[in-house]
Amino acid sequence: MKQNIKAAMAMEKVYRQLQNNRVAKDAFGYQDKLKQFGFADTVEYELAKDEYYLKNSGIPVEFVNIRNLATERAKAIAEGREVMHLITADETFVYAGDNCVDCDRHYIAQNGLFVFDYPGASAIVATQYDLALGLLTKRLSLFPLVMERLSQSLRELGLDCYVEKNDILVAGKKIVGGGSYVQDGMLVCGIQISFVVDREKITAICHKPQVKIPMGITEFQAVKRDDLIAKVASWLL
């Protein structure tokens, strides 16, 4: 049966109005009504709502340089404004988690590298050839869908890749790393996409044993960053 997400959401709105009426709520038949609208269960329905939200909420796409990201992100969160930041840089830099104990900050300072601090326990070395996605949204369940959409877009561009937890891998090698957290009621998603890796600096900065070897997309496939940007923008239109 074809899914009717709009009808299902209208039904859910009625159902939510019965939350204080136990008898009416039990008699409503929420699960049966979901099936009537083409959804096998609540898991499938919630995923469909995520997809509908991502496509129909009018989330704008904005380019931002990593040096301006902290300011632009804080401003958007303070305003409660949803946005997809496409993050670029002019040089090699470091994402450093505030709980990262394996990050060589002495080397970073000695070499004058820009550091973007974030809530986390890892350090990531990025280059000017890379791209990162910074999604701010009020829908707190979107991170897994965004990772899957990104993996699908990369497959459409010729990469044999797949999602594994918070990473996207090709032949077991890590080309994308992501994470999310909630701040002031907004989901903050950060997803780093490596096109070209700087192995020398990764070795010098990241002392944590590597479970998944980082690789650049261009080592597997001649994917153009602009083509991926176009794919990402299409998710929101």
Regions found by a protein language model. Give the residues of each.
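N-terminal lobe of the biotin/lipoate ligase/transferase fold
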Residues: 2-141
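Beta-strand scaffold of nucleotide-dependent catalytic cores
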Residues: 116, 178-179
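Residue-level detector of family-conserved "landmark" positions at structurally sensitive sites
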Residues: 118, 163-164
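Structural motif
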Residues: 170-171
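Long, positively charged amphipathic alpha-helical accessory segments at protein N-termini or as interdomain linkers
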Residues: 7, 14, 20-26, 32-37, ...
